[in-house]
């Protein structure tokens, strides 16, 4: 169930303050707020989004508006599954 339209998108207030303070400067903004929704004011800015261990660089484009910051900073690293070897197929 999604968020009610009358409530509007959730964005942490400190992110909006930082965007307003930066203005035209494109300095990366470090944040732990993966839950914040990307709004049109964020387009063209770079965010450093925490993934639980490190900060992932996320450059915001117009296609990302309406999504959450956390969607673009994966928390799990995929280690490939075991390859089929000749030894396994001999059985």
Swiss-Prot record:
A single Pfam family it belongs to is Ribosomal_S19
Return the InterPro entries for the record: Ribosomal_uS19, Ribosomal_uS19_bac-type, Ribosomal_uS19_CS, Ribosomal_uS19_SF
Per the UniProt entry, the disulfide pairs are: none
**Per the record's keyword annotation, is rRNA-binding included, yes or no?**
yes
| Keywords tagged on the record | Ribonucleoprotein, Ribosomal protein, RNA-binding, rRNA-binding
Statement: the UniProt record of this protein carries the keyword Membrane: no
Q: Per UniProt, what is one GO molecular function of this protein?
A: structural constituent of ribosome
List cellular component terms (GO): cytoplasm; small ribosomal subunit
- Example GO biological process: ribosomal small subunit assembly
* NCBIfam families attached to this UniProt entry: rpsS_bact (TIGR01050)
HAMAP family to which the protein is assigned, alphabetical: Ribosomal_uS19
Q: Which PANTHER family match?
A: RIBOSOMAL PROTEIN S19P FAMILY MEMBER, SMALL RIBOSOMAL SUBUNIT PROTEIN US19M
Q: What does this protein do?
A: Protein S19 forms a complex with S13 that binds strongly to the 16S ribosomal RNA.
Protein name, as recorded: Small ribosomal subunit protein uS19
Report the source organism: Methylacidiphilum infernorum (isolate V4)
């Amino acid at each position: 169930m999604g968020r009610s339209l009358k409530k509007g998108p959730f964005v942490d207030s400190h992110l909006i303050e930082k965007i307003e303070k930066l203005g035209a400067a494109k300095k990366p903004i470090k944040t732990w707020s993966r839950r914040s929704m990307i709004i049109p004011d964020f387009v063209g800015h770079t965010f450093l989004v925490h993934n639980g261990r490190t900060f992932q660089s996320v450059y915001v484009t117009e296609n990302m508006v309406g999504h959450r910051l956390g969607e673009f900073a994966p928390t799990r690293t995929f280690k490939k599954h075991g390859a089929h070897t000749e030894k396994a197929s001999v059985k």
